[in-house]
Amino acid sequence: MIDYKSLGLSEEDLKVIYKWMDLGRKIDERLWLLNRAGKIPFVVSGQGQEATQIGMAYALEEGDITAPYYRDLAFVTYMGISAYDTFLSAFGKKDDVNSGGKQMPSHFSSRAKNILSQSSPVATQIPHAVGAALALKMDGKKKIATATVGEGSSNQGDFHEGLNFAGVHKLPFVCVIINNKYAISVPDSLQYAAEKLSDRALGYGIHGEQVDGNDPLAMYKAMKEARERAISDQGSTLIEAVTSRMTAHSSDDDDQYRTKEEREALKKADCNEKFKKELLSAGIIDDAWLAEIEAEHKDIINKATKAAEDAPYPSVEEAYAFVYEEGSLN
């Protein structure tokens, strides 16, 4: 484990980081159970990526703008999208904070939390976040904009256009490629020939680095340093977080393109289990503390699930709400 004290973190910080990683995982696991029970139609999972997500989130400051991608459940949970909010979205209920029950699950959005609305076409959030970074720079605010994408998105035109613009204008922008080595069923060997995707930063004139995405402290360090550069007028950063996708692409995907041995190896590399063992070994947490957290998160999720399931669906009359501006043509 990285020397957390050198990062300005305390033992309490590490416990908080683990708690959010665990809550994100538990919400994710409940979504899968609801899907398999036939209660919700679709799940796209972030299991195995919680270390990257919470490490990144923990380094951000209030007022920063984020453009997450669909696997960033733990990230948006930390940013303020509650378990109840997530289940409302999964059930397609009226009070879904993302879209009022209109958008697909895991298409996060919250003006109050500075979370830009997620689109289904991948990489489109990069130009959106770069535009937000431009606005922050023009307004003279010491804040940053971030976008996260999977490694498959790094081959999209929006990726190049956004990072090129960010580099030219030295914007306070950080792009995180969460490299879980699969774009649905396409392995990384068929996605790119470079040794590191972070090396692409050189062509944009920005800082680039590859980090261990299974280590929340490594991710925290990289994002904290990137943020400091950004607010100090040193331009943008491209971070490649190498991590794992422990599930199929989604609940509609057959994961047979990965061997049984490969899937088993992913479980052994579980970032949550790895970090938990490190904290136990260091004496920062113990079994009693873990049992308390387990009970707390189980209670949160059970209550949120029931409340969301019992919540009303949108009415037919609300079909066009938030689609067209209300009012007369005169």
Please report, for each region that a protein language model flagged, where it lies by residue.
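A general secondary-structure junction signal
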Residues: 70, 241-243, 323
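Conserved acidic/glycine
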Residues: 1-52, 59-60, 246-247, 251-256, ...
